[in-house]
Amino acid sequence: MEQPLCVLGIETTCDDTGLSIVIDQKIKSNIVISSANLHVKTGGVVPEIAARCHEQNLFKAIRDLNFEIRDLSHIAYACNPGLAGCLHVGATFARSLSFLLDKPLLPINHLYAHIFSCLIDQDLNKLQLPALGLVISGGHTAIYLVKSFYELELIAETSDDAIGEVYDKIGRAMGFDYPAGSKIDSLFNKELVKPHYFFKPSTKWTKFSYSGLKSQCLNKIKQISANKTRIDWSELASNFQATIIDHYIDHVKNAIKKFAPKMLLVGGGVSANSYLSNRISTLNLPFLIADSKYTSDNGAMIGFYASLLINGDKN
């Protein structure tokens, strides 16, 4: 009897430590331990602190999995992109397990795993290729042309800040704890959105740039804070969110015109944003957005994508 495909997925690219058991492309357990509370004071991730937390959390997480690791068939880990120290901790842990258990080791691209996370718990027959892979997270903002599980072509990326990073910096200026994306999204009111409240970034469609919008928004926050003691941030939050998401969608529209994809695959922490999902639904293409359990960094998406690659090799 053939052994089931049983993959351990390891995620340590930023501040979330993730371990998951994926058996025959089904998520059997998924442990995520975040160190975000340790980064609240700085308003962003401190790489050295995050790496030390991974060292402690990986051993706790593997105990919490409550799984006999000798039954694994493969070990997969996020190898790039990410914070160097955090990646090193995850890679060392994965290599050590691979050596001790004599199991095959698969290095996995973190962004590709985000893209295909929208297929978790889905019928894979829904996948239509070529597709556009949309990555919108705290560390990355990009669009990929997805030709197969193995072949992804980068067609647009940020030249400075990622969307999620801007959300966190704007949220910090408004007095919100890190991470701030969900708080800003909760304040969104379409009725408060005004034309030209902020100037939309002007860039080539193959590049995103959000540093200018970030500066506009921070200056506006300073003006409002100087003139008011009690502040309702709803108007500013609504216009900020509309501007930054609409700009991203403009790039997606250009990519659709150029590459004629059959569907959209959406992943990353910002994919949980309500306005983003609303705008994507207007693009007249089938789309899949990752379940909220899998939008932030997690081991399940690493193990799941590894399973897709392994099965592809078998076929």
Swiss-Prot record:
Location of the protein in the cell: Cytoplasm
Residues involved in substrate binding: V135, I136, S137, G138, G139, D168, G181, D185, N273
Catalytic activity: L-threonylcarbamoyladenylate + adenosine(37) in tRNA = N(6)-L-threonylcarbamoyladenosine(37) in tRNA + AMP + H(+)
Molecular function (Gene Ontology), one example: iron ion binding
Keywords: Acyltransferase, Cytoplasm, Iron, Metal-binding, Transferase, tRNA processing
InterPro entries per record: ATPase_NBD (IPR043129), Gcp-like_dom (IPR000905), KAE1/TsaD (IPR017861), Peptidase_M22_CS (IPR017860), TsaD (IPR022450)
Pfam family, one: TsaD
Gene3D superfamilies reported for this sequence: 3.30.420.40
Listed EC numbers: 2.3.1.234
The record's free-text note on cofactor binding: Binds 1 Fe(2+) ion per subunit.
Binding of Fe cation, residues: H110, H114, D297
GO CC annotation: cytoplasm
Cofactor(s) required for function per UniProt: Fe(2+)
Top EC class of this enzyme: transferase
GO terms of biological process kind: tRNA threonylcarbamoyladenosine modification
Major location (coarse): cytoplasm
Similarity comment: family membership: Belongs to the KAE1 / TsaD family.
Function: Required for the formation of a threonylcarbamoyl group on adenosine at position 37 (t(6)A37) in tRNAs that read codons beginning with adenine. Is involved in the transfer of the threonylcarbamoyl moiety of threonylcarbamoyl-AMP (TC-AMP) to the N6 group of A37, together with TsaE and TsaB. TsaD likely plays a direct catalytic role in this reaction.
Protein name, as recorded: tRNA N6-adenosine threonylcarbamoyltransferase
The species this protein was found in: Mycoplasma genitalium (strain ATCC 33530 / DSM 19775 / NCTC 10195 / G37) (Mycoplasmoides genitalium)
Gene: tsaD
